[in-house]
Amino acid sequence: MKTNSLLRRGAFAAAVLVAAPLVAADLSEVADLKPLAMKVYGIRSVERKGDKTLAVTLGASSSAGARRLVNAWRVTSPDDPAYAYSKFVKPDSVAEVSSEVEFKYPDGMAEQKKVMPSLSRTVVELKLPTPMKKNCQYAAVAYGAEMEVVTSGRTGLYAGEDAVAADLAAAIVGLRRVSSVGEGKLLCEFGAGYSPAGGNSAANWKVTVNGKPRPVLALGRRSKIDCYVPKGWGGTYPCLMQHDVFLDIGDTLKKGDKVSVEVTAAVTAGARDASFAFDESKCVSRSIQANQVGYLPDAPKFAYVGCWFGSFPDAKFAGGAGARKCANTKLAVSSLAFDANPSFEIVDEKSGKPVKKGTAKFVFSGNEKESKKASYAASNVWELDFSDVRTPGRYFIRIPGVGRSLAFHIDKAVYEKALKVQALGVYEQRCGIALDPKLTRGWERIACHAGGVTASTCARVKNPEFAPFDKHVVNGADGKPLVLAASGGHHDAGDYNPRSHLDVAQALLNCYELKPDAFADGQFAVPERGNGIPDIVDEALWQLKLWKGLQDEDGGIRAGTESLRDPGFFQTVELDDTGDYAWAKDSKMSFQCAGAFAQAARILKKCGKAAEAKDFLSRAQRAYEWGKANPTPGLKDGQDKEYNSDPRAYAAVSLYHTTRDAKYHDDFKAISPWASNPKAEVSSWGKYDLSLAARQYLLLPKELADATLRKTIEEAMFAEFRMFKSGSAKWPYKFLRNPWAPITWGTGAYENYAVTAAHLYALTGDKECREWLVRTCDNTLGANPLGLSWITGLGERTIRCPLHNSRYRAAGGPVIGLQAQGPMQRGHGYSFKETLYPAWKEGEAVLHAFIDNHWAIAMDEPTVNNMANTLLVFGVLSK
């Protein structure tokens, strides 16, 4: 191979052979480069060599140890039974045929190279156990072994399909593309080959507009991890970086301007030039952030314009004349700044004609902080209000001198699409069942944890997560460990941990009762379609199936399931050796299940499933009585309400709703604080949490509820909503959050703090609740500082690398419907802080603290209970 043989020749080019044009010019029209980067850094190609060999080419995200191991690979075929997925076929042997440095880092990167792998290209050959058939497809899938993964890039590919060309590899490693930011600023996107030292010299840059040179006045940079080469568990990983470099070239671009950027070999390995023709109707700018799925016709519609330039103007940049000064001196120079509030247009994509013209509203200066302790957006921000555009259609936002947004819909069905994708994500988390590739859009998975659950005496109150279950098993009459006939539920997160989540069922059942007309049988991709039960209820029942199996004859219910430890993130299901154990019975989960079982009973009765309804109600009543008779012992301060009175209040009101027996209503009133203290909050941190009970009470038919008590609880929930609204009311990017909750583990991406507003809106029609639900969904679906949709499959520019075992398949990446945790305020581990530029500081640019790669677990791992809450919110907004 001739390294860099496809780089263009230009004024700054080295004397290398020239072949086809570099694809970087074409990349200017790609909505999201992340999938291409994963292809370049992971499996690039798979080729058949005879009938028993597959040659696999790997990019720079490749572990030298793992890629040579037989146990790290699988070979699968959709049409050759000998290589069926369920057989988990391994190669007989793996041989490394070649490994060479494909791109050499520029000089002056000694410090960066300490954490960066070489930019290598490797070929391994997999020798197969049986011959491949002539007319069948075969895929190589890279897993991992011995605590190393083969790659963090693309993990699977069919032979002869979608191979990466050398010019694409050069573009992804080097200068990927150039785009408009606005007001004379350009964004140059670089891959791992970029040298900060080389980029900090103006002499190494050549920028032209319409063939005329433009000086680079100032430069800023944001750098973070693009892809890992994981070895071991946690710690510091070798990593491949991505760099957003912002150039100030002075004058604002006009339609038709042809922009070209070239750099010397001192700036980057790989591709060194890129160009584009500026047109506000065609050039997507990352400065404009909107909901990528769309907006309801009669709902508020907001988008934003703003862009943080990182270190701009970087003091290390030599040779520039200095950044152009903005007329508005109150604005931060480190982000996009307009002399006056910019105009914008909402454009019908089909006709190309504007349907609205407006002026953006200035809402925030990047010189300010959203709170006393933290800066979140870190940029100047303008808000675009186009709420008066109501005609259904597909639109985009256009701003002179900046560019356009990604397209979005205005339609009454936008949340139905979001709902179905999120429902698919929850289905993909099912445990104890084989997943049908016809339903998952191609992901096949055998049934897991279907052999029953081993009973233990471990109390969950003493071990909130893992416990030494294998040392505390319950033996049956035969003296052997007692295995309960329990299966079902949903996996906790991205691996095969069977940690049970009753709250999935609680969210889905509540969603159905809040808006029953929005749900039907046959609506979602679930195997129970056609059984006469709405699909959202079927999904909830799959969760309850597990808890039914955990109920003893005396009515008590074990406190859930857990494994000995987290499974390996690159293990296939059949290799999971962490076990499936049940906690001891306790009052908390007995009461919680009583409430959920009672709710399922009344829903199933309305669906004409009398026998199933009767069984659930009997189980609910027995669980409730057991919980009352067996309060959890050994509780510490503050735990009594968590384990006894709080869940009992929830169970009591749900049983009252189902049975109409006043004794349960009396129990609820005796337990809840509102009879004696009408000002009591729904929950108080560390003291009590009556959220489940309060929501259940509002679901009561009016003739069953105590009118005064219901109004009191409703007011308490509105007070909680107003508190969550205050969490970002003064922020430029608005979404519901607890003002005391840091941006961590989903706070900046999930809908968890929107659940209260969802109940209130569905039951009262409150317009303010609806507006904040919509704005929270906007944040999830792209209207955030990063311009990312946090859910795979919803939008054109989304997260691509959630930590999820569906990435180990022939498609080479995760399924749709998975929601990432999002920004992590303290940049938890995984080399994030060590590699970030500008250097990480507590409380700065918090909403930018995100890496889109599987191994940044606190940022990228989906969790099923949170996805169920998102489904609930989408459901309330649908139809």
Regions found by a protein language model. Give the residues of each.
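Short, surface-exposed alpha-helix to beta-strand junction/turn motifs within ectodomains of secreted
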Residues: 30-33, 63-111, 193-228, 316-350
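Aromatic (Trp/Tyr) and acidic
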Residues: 173-179, 186, 194-202, 225-240, ...
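N-terminal non-catalytic regions of secreted/periplasmic and cell-surface proteins
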Residues: 26-74, 79, 141-143, 154-206, ...
